[in-house]
Amino acid sequence: MSQQCKTVLDNGMTVISRTKPDVRSVSLGLWFNVGSRDERPDQAGLTHFMEHMMFKGTPTKGPLDISMHFDRLGAELNAFTSKEYTCYYARFVDDKLEDALSVLAEMVIESNFSQDAIDTEREVVIEEIARSEDTPDDYVYELYSQSNLPNHPCGLPVLGTRDRVGSYRHADCVDFHAEHYHAGNLTLAAAGNVDHDQLVTLAKRYFASMKPGKKEHRKLLQPQFSSGLFSQKRDIEQAHIVYGVPWLPLGNERRYIATVLTTILGGSMSSRLFQEVREKRGLVYSIYAMQAGYQGVGQWCIYAGTRPSNTQEVMRLIRSELDAIAQDYVSEDELSRNIDLICGQLLLGLESTNSHMVRLGKRETLGLEQTTPEQQTEGYRSVTKQQVLDMAQELLSAEPAIAVISPYSQEELSDLVFG
């Protein structure tokens, strides 16, 4: 039987865990309450750059030493940066807990940010930016976000820009680390065959030297959304389209309705958009709907990739499906089938210790209630057909922002999209 526990240490650090004694693995994450939205204009991409630098050595371990240490543990080691948090995580066999945690702690507390390592890693991140820009089905989301939220930090790319990343020096890293990498801004989340009391004891030992503090509370700016057509002309084989509208912020009480609506429209192979645009007409390979909720702001969008000559027809079909669902064309069977899908995927995902760890760490870092899977499935099953229809009408009435990367000019696209 699994058990969830939480402890706040004297230095402000939070330790939260879910014990699953029926497995041998442990997934452990160090979650820092800092993301790209917390950067000043002169720090664009610095949060993500710092994530890279944490792997580049401490006074006692070089980057190869760190990699070899986790290899010897038979462990997975990685990290990621989002708009609202940064996470360093490892997955390992349960008897390697102290060996893994001690080095993770050393990485985030004692990284030395040598100028040689910074010079090399700047080039690595610039290559990462180039890879993203060369992937139009990825980069079209950046175009959409930057155009839809032009004066909001959630509209800016997590990776930053070449110019800013190319300018970072030792002092920038030291100052950013001192400002954000303190105990009050850190949640240690673990799931698997782990004892909570042992985890707390180890956290006290290995994070004793970390600067204490209180959790940072970010100032939430009022979002100003822009609508219209935003395009980038490229010599490519497909038109990559994102059609989006302002949406619910993180933790909104209507989030269960929103997920059901999104799934009906474009969340599976039986969804409206997949069936109508791909299966019946063969106009796309990839089409789906998604939502992104952040503190104080949210976005909802549809992505489609199609032959440029099909752009107008795909846009027509997207609007047609939005209109249909808003006009009461949802059966009780379709509603229940999609709710079953959501609940089933939720429960299947929680068989992984990593999924449990991410769930714990993300919700604690963002100040969300630690709801149980049972509470979530109950929330989805309480959604009614009328609630879905009402939300669909709101979605349809919102002014969209449409981002397109294609061989067409802005003028040509305007005729196709709005003509």
Where does each model-flagged region fall?
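M16/MPP (pitrilysin/insulinase) zinc-metallopeptidase core fold and M16-derived inactive scaffolds
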Residues: 22, 27-91, 264-283, 294
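Flexible, small-/acidic-enriched active-site or ligand-binding loops
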Residues: 228
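Charge-rich, well-structured scaffold segments of protease-associated domains
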Residues: 3, 8, 19, 63-215, ...
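Short glycine/proline-enriched turns and hinge-like loops at secondary-structure junctions
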Residues: 42, 254-256
